Amino acid sequence: MTGSNQPSDCYLAALRLLTGRDYTCAALRRKLQQKRFAAEEAQQAVERLIREGYLQDQRYAERLVAAVRQNGSFTGYRLQQELRRRGVPPELIDQVLRESPADGDELERARHLVERRYAGFDPQAADERQLRRVAGFLQRRGYRSDLIRQLFEK
């Protein structure tokens, strides 16, 4: 802080950033440093925001997991990678994924995703190239190989 009761410019910049969207602690610290604030000043602002309840990695991770699972865009390993990329600590990733209820059946979500992307896809009638294309699409979204095989067998 610059004065006894005056919030620092860094803290105010962090608050402005948080009005636009959620950040993890690491991402906000990085963003503040990109705006040319010193690392120590950015750290102090982040710590203050945590104390005041404006910044919580767990809340960020829970919201992201819920949103991703709701739209079914990706799952599994891809979801872990996305959380890691956004700066969520690894121990928190495991905890949030364990505690977060998976909406519905993963096989059904994969089936729905394939139907949306490849309308009329029939694994029994598809040639090898089509099967590889759909399998790659699902794998890039974090679906396991055994689940993809199961989807193709039905």
From Swiss-Prot:
Main location: cytoplasm
Organism domain of life: Bacteria
GO annotation, cellular component aspect: cytoplasm
Keywords tagged on the record: Cytoplasm
One GO-annotated biological process of the protein: regulation of DNA repair
UniProt key word Metal-binding: no
Listed Pfam families: RecX_HTH1, RecX_HTH2, RecX_HTH3
Subcellular location: Cytoplasm
InterPro entries recorded: RecX_HTH_1st, RecX_HTH_2nd, RecX_HTH_3rd, Regulatory_RecX, WH-like_DNA-bd_sf
Role description: Modulates RecA activity.
Family: Belongs to the RecX family.
Record protein name field: Regulatory protein RecX
Organism for this UniProt entry: Trichlorobacter lovleyi (strain ATCC BAA-1151 / DSM 17278 / SZ) (Geobacter lovleyi)
Record gene name: recX
